[in-house]
């Protein structure tokens, strides 16, 4: 596949992150889409270069993506239990 495809998918996920800010779940899905496109781009670019220093980079990126997904799930469950919804409007800094 062409690396331009993954760059375009990253930009689409970034625009989704900018425009769909009502629910926390939609924000986390856009972040996961961005992480997936970066992972695919890193995997393709490391296969093109064939350097030993770039081979573990997609695996490291995948590890960070899994950690991000776990943390986002914990945040979503915690917010749903405390606020009874996942709306971003219910989050303010003054409630802390």
From Swiss-Prot:
Subcellular location: Mitochondrion membrane
Alphabetical UniProt keywords: Electron transport, Membrane, Mitochondrion, NAD, Respiratory chain, Translocase, Transmembrane, Transmembrane helix, Transport, Ubiquinone
Main EC class the enzyme belongs to: translocase
GO cellular component, one term: respiratory chain complex I
Example of a GO MF term: NADH dehydrogenase (ubiquinone) activity
InterPro entries membership: NUOK/Mnh_C1-like (IPR039428)
Location (main, coarse): mitochondrion
Pfam families: Oxidored_q2
EC number(s) reported in the record: 7.1.1.2
Catalytic reactions on record: a ubiquinone + NADH + 5 H(+)(in) = a ubiquinol + NAD(+) + 4 H(+)(out)
Topology class, membrane: Multi-pass membrane protein
Listed transmembrane segments: 1-21, 24-44, 57-77
Family statement drawn from the similarity comment of this UniProt entry: Belongs to the complex I subunit 4L family.
Its biological purpose: Core subunit of the mitochondrial membrane respiratory chain NADH dehydrogenase (Complex I) which catalyzes electron transfer from NADH through the respiratory chain, using ubiquinone as an electron acceptor. Part of the enzyme membrane arm which is embedded in the lipid bilayer and involved in proton translocation.
Protein name, per record: NADH-ubiquinone oxidoreductase chain 4L
Organism (species): Myxine glutinosa
Gene for this chain: MT-ND4L
